[in-house]
Amino acid sequence: MEKDSLSRADQQYECVAEIGEGAYGKVFKARDLKNGGRFVALKRVRVQTSEEGMPLSTIREVAVLRHLETFEHPNVVRLFDVCTVSRTDRETKLTLVFEHVDQDLTTYLDKVPEPGVPTETIKDMMFQLLRGLDFLHSHRVVHRDLKPQNILVTSSGQIKLADFGLARIYSFQMALTSVVVTLWYRAPEVLLQSSYATPVDLWSVGCIFAEMFRRKPLFRGSSDVDQLGKILDIIGLPGEEDWPRDVALPRQAFHSKSAQPIEKFVTDIDELGKDLLLKCLTFNPAKRISAYGALNHPYFQDLERYKDNLNSHLPSNQSTSELNTA
């Protein structure tokens, strides 16, 4: 990370427009004046500092992002640069410079004409999404906040994951803002405030998979408990053995109910797609499919052109299903 009191970020990058503002800070579309005026996305985040400087957790997260960037994975957004500027003794402005992609999956789904996204396009996008996610998991990165707004879609239909590996960097900025973070893609173990690991991302993938068919979210809760209730209305109340032990909210707080047919809520999905969706939307994270397992699901068996180069982005013998968060 380069620190410059004259703000190198302001010298090298010319802001064109503000393109987003969320719990994590503002995002700007900008020109990179040192690289032919290419468009980039600037994400500006405020980080709490102390006498010792920037928190070690922040430095580690940036180091992980830098390491992932060396692989240039096709389904992960590129990180071009990181700049820091001290604002005060207790705060630093961190500027992350990413490649710019014009639309996210939310915009894409809003714009798609009737009758919706072709089933083959959904399959293609899902495979790319899972390939990017498996790459992150194989490098011990849990996304934690996967949703259509941070899945980018290029003009050629390439999927790129964004906003990963930044949970600790974002924590201070989020405490300063009142923006509500959506619950609609959160796994049951997160809603119950239980321990969690990579399976949380596969739950989010299941929600996104369903939304590609529906063009609207599958579970739209207004609070953690309401969200959990909406989930159980569809997938049914799990057995006692699948309810986490370390949570304040007991299984008995919810009415006993059976699972409803998923095709009632996700029409046009075929049998293999339904099987994959239910494996993602499995209540118990230990029984949920992994990203690597999902990539090898029969649903994708006719996408051999992707499987040919899948292994070039995976470490050998890497199990990705049980990585714990620190």
UniProtKB/Swiss-Prot annotation:
Subcellular location: Cytoplasm; Nucleus; Cell projection, Ruffle; Cytoplasm, Cytoskeleton, Microtubule organizing center, Centrosome
Classification via SMART domains: S_TKc (SM00220)
Modified residues (N6-acetyllysine): K264
Disrupted-gene phenotype: Slight anemia and defective proliferation of some hematopoietic cells, thymocytes and progenitor cells. Females are reduced in size and often sterile. Prevents the expansion of neuronally committed precursors by prematurely exiting the cell cycle and lengthening G1 phase duration, reducing concomitantly the production of newborn neurons.
Modified residues (Phosphotyrosine): Y13, Y24
Effect of S321A: In strain: SPRET/Ei
UniProt cross-references to InterPro entries, sorted A to Z: CDK (IPR050108), CDK6 (IPR028788), Kinase-like_dom_sf (IPR011009), Prot_kinase_dom (IPR000719), Protein_kinase_ATP_BS (IPR017441), Ser/Thr_kinase_AS (IPR008271)
EC nos: 2.7.11.22
In-chain residues carrying the UniProt-annotated modification Phosphothreonine: T49, T70, T177, T325
Activity-regulation annotation: Activated by Thr-177 phosphorylation and Tyr-24 dephosphorylation. Rapidly down-regulated prior to cell differentiation (e.g. erythroid and osteoblast).
A Pfam family annotated for this UniProt entry: Pkinase
Subunit structure: Interaction with D-type G1 cyclins. Cyclin binding promotes enzyme activation by phosphorylation at Thr-177. Binds to RUNX1, CDKN2D, FBXO7 and CDKN2C/p18-INK4c. Forms a cytoplasmic complex with Hsp90/HSP90AB1 and CDC37. FBXO7-binding promotes D-type cyclin binding.
Name of the molecule in the record: Cyclin-dependent kinase 6
Gene name tied to this protein: Cdk6
